[in-house]
């Protein structure tokens, strides 16, 4: 797959470089369909849109889907490119080459290339009718399937393949080794030179592209405004037209793109989109480098045509997802996302999506962003951009180094980001130039400059849904409003390509922004090491940029925005970057904005917002964060967007995005060259600091989860990682996301506050995390994480910008995210996917849900990092919005209006309405989360908090029993219903729209739902290479096993490995050459290497996204992610067996879902960005949810809940979305009732599959109907090990040491146990307690050692040797007695309390005379000393024992008394036995008869033999040999004959029960054979000696003891001694007699002693008799039995004869039965 992706990517890249046609060709797989559908592109798009589940109406839906498809395609390319970038970052030459080239060609192919070739891609995608789903599919299909496979998969997928192919081609052209293998090869060193040139070219391309993107963004913004007006209405009305929401987004993206927008915006939009996609960070670059505004609608193909949709998406995405822009409102989130983020979100979304797509989140970006917009963003955007007026941008992007730069920044970003070891990593341009300064922070697609890329990826994941949002800029893109971003682009034209928007978002909603300001700055071309790292700039510069970005924003608002960003932790004082990246408090403190102070974007650390989003809480900026995430007006806008059209909201975010983008562009342009150097230097510094912080603040992740870390991380991490983040953003952000996922989950309390404004880097795309913690060691992952984090950041941005949007348009449903992530597993991290889905879903869902219920599009899957900060991760995520191509209809429970944004979430979209069964709707995902948290599962009571924006949401969000969020459907698959949580009983999310969306089942391995790959634990399969289709990214080792995306040509991807199986690495991407190595188990989940063709492989889920929680997946359950910043108390770490605990609920979420039950195994971590959203971790009791469906495959039906029995079969990929199977009931042990079916999850989802308005079936898995109220909250919170209430007996009972079996803890739920059927009857405890209580148990006393006061060691005197002291100490610890008890037993001979064994132990360990002397001496010497040192415990104990009167003498007498009696009795028994045997052998009648028979037969046999015949006797030694003498026919032995003869002739009782054995019993003979007279004599002598000693000791006691202690000892011992003497003498006499008798017996049998012996020993004599007796008895038993039978027969015969025949009338037929005979009697 990887290589194929690489090929596709290269092809796309080359083609894009070559030009629109070439791009189309190169993008073949994606564009092929688009191209194939070229003239009939709209048909194809419509077809794809419909097929993708986004088709909704074919034309517009198809168009939107085309855009989504093109986005998906672009994302595939971007994803591949990202992968290439990552690989390059790690690999160096290949990375750079691929980054610069792939970024230019690959990512630009995704974005740039698409831009260059955008016309083709755009047209092909758009015209091909690629849908969002298709787009996601194309990313999925970006396998080498080429047009064929792409088409087979989805129209969009061919586009993705085309894009990827183009990217691959361009990559090939750019890279020294054009082979896919090289691109994805770990050995891309040959491309290092190319990498350098690519970096330079990427820088130039970025600059040019940034300019073009700026122009494009402006055009797009205009188009978006135009279309945004169209889409804004649609998004606002998205509730009703949820299909419209998606379709609207699609319309914005696809409609405009597919329609008029396609032609004009096809090239332009595609280019813009590709530029945006490539430059989510380059959004600024896009504005800066406005790709000639070919046409307003042509900004990005998706953007131009779908600018209205894209703009709303952009607005929503940037605003609601990326930033707390007013446009981000609950309604807007759902419907207004497109409107509100049209300009911003679209720009950012597109950029982010592109960046993410380049990062390898095509599916996420494209599919999630907009049904079509996402693919178009990736595929069509570039295509349209290339085709449309944006063609120059496309040309400049892929065509010119500058545009390429915009797509993939060549800064050291790539290499410094993290060590890329896998091909995907090498191929994923972590820091590739492709990320444009304007990249949407939310879509930190290709933070080429590490941050940019990371943020881009994050943005992509967050803004992936908002490809349109890409244009918005990383920040807005985080939310990734599929349709809105276009509008935002139009509205935010002032905001230069997402980079400015990124910056704005980063600044305005750093914590909410998808991309950290550094990323934004980088995207915006802001120079600064910030590109590679967080941008370092003065507050004044930021304000200026914001002003420039926000043309309409007053300086006060910009400053306020900056403060918010700081509060969110997105913007950090530069000093904080290196100080405490993880300290969210720092971020909070940073809330006060100082123009003269140096700031950097929180690079890796997820801002508090991010954390909040990660938490899954949707409270928009939590007040705790300090300044509200969004400006009040922004929050207002969010609400307005929700209530009003999103376009209005989009405009403000758009302006902000524009300002941010401009600022970012300025920043990028200011220090592009400097940034690279600074980034390299800063990255190194930050890496060191991050590593340091990682070590120093390993818990900070948790802290971040608690929110402080998210904040501090957002700030400090963004500060520290700011520069590095640009580079490491992908790696670091990924890693940080992982960490932040932890942080996010762990810091739910700070969610609200943190949500306020997570720093850009904190955006989902870049969850802030301790720079040290994540930056250094995790740098590798940071890049990938960055990709993932980008969406997170985007989410954060959304939080800040589009809190409402986030809520309204929850991040793309996990399905979408998943499909996006899977669609571009390698190229776009789940975050990207998340972004894309988020954008797309958010737009469509926002639109659809906004009106209908404010139900955010499914919040990011709890486990979905890609959902950037899926609330669902932290909380039950809202159902993922339908795939881009399909509008997700409001969930049944979606009807519930979204709750208004939480107080602190001014900019956060309101949390989606709780699921029907959900008690409390989960708070909307953080703006940076991009994905709204799913409403709490019905049973969950409280949905898990949305993941923090900056922090990927830790996978744990799903409650142990809740089976939390399901992964979003694969990008190309449409939106699969989220797999039901194993324990959650949540029905699987509806299948992906485009995929015949079978509900993605939790990972098949689902004893444990595959956690979204932990950042370090394993990443869900990275998106497949563009040409490869979407191969599943290798699941992280500890991540549970995300199903690898299907190979490009592989129709349905292989089912993900069973969770219990560990995470099998996904098949290598076609273009990957070497499949990405699975993440190290202990490393957290390293992001899979980016697919070569995928652009940047999806970074591991953002720390806050889901991976962070599961980073510990490898060997352990997933540790609970740190509580979200605003979440308050982080959820307790999951039980050892629990796997990943759900993140604590977001501050507004209320109760966080309980961590998965221990039996649940590890909840699946959020899916990796490239993987899309993995199915949410199953509830602990549920077992493992089925793995999420592969991106390229529809969504496989979620596996039945562990306890559910058989899950409904997943719908066939082509089936459309089958109704999500009702979640199977949790196993009895789960204690959690199965969650109700997703509101639309069941058939409702299906109906929507074909339409753009795929019902948002809470596909996220969390949005689906909440688990039964008691299920999620109670079952999850209960001990994982018990499904029954604890019993508290009235009295302490005796223990019953059985082995407990707990059903819910059974990993293998397939086998049923009887215990599942058995019910405990009620019992009467009273009688039972009386019988089995511990009433007789004495009060347990403390060990005697505890009764002795122990002084300080220094003051203790040790007089005993170490060994002796240890022995006495052990004895003391074993004695639960008081010294008075011991004294009582010794003095009064009372053994009731102190038994003889204890007395013996005390006697053996008593103080010896010398020891006692020392002790006494010390006591005397210390009496006069005031501060004398006390004795050690052993010495004290021995001394106290010695104080007992005559302890030694008394105990000796007591012990001897007991042993003497036992010894005498034993000797007596043995002697008696000997005497008995001797007498029997001599005089026993049976013995005589037997011996006589033996003699007779022997003599007869020896007759005639003079030497042996005529014997009078025989030696006894022949007796044992009789059994060996056989008859002539060997039928029997002589002994058997003798026995038979004896019984028949001598034993009158033979055959009777009273028959007696004639010989001594064998066992008696054996005992006698073991006796020795010498032993008897020895024992008697010893007893006699001891008796004398006892008498002496007793005499001493008599003499010394006082009268009070004399009795009863004296009386008792005197009696004993007298009797003992008598007994001892008697036994001596008995022994003498027995010995004499034995000798007589041996002589009697003429036994002679053996040579050397004086006399015959008992052993010699009795051994012979023992053997003979044993053999004789065996035959005797058999013969006796035969005789008995014969006698019975004879008796019967006699009886018969006596009765006579006359007594019976026997009929032949009755003659056989006695009964018959009796009845026939006459």
From Swiss-Prot:
The keyword Lipid metabolism does not apply. Residues 758-1268 form the FH1 domain. It comes from Homo sapiens. Residues 193-231, 670-706, 1567-1597, 1677-1699 form a coiled coil. Its main location: cytoplasm. GO terms for cellular component: actin cytoskeleton; cell cortex; cytoplasmic vesicle membrane; cytosol; endoplasmic reticulum; endoplasmic reticulum membrane; microvillus; nucleolus. This is Formin-2. Induction: Up-regulated in response to cellular stress, hypoxia and DNA damage via NF-kappa-B. It comes from the Eukaryota. The lineage of its organism: Eukaryota, Metazoa, Chordata, Craniata, Vertebrata. Interacts with SPIRE1. Binds actin. Interacts with CDKN1A. One of its GO terms (molecular function) is actin binding.
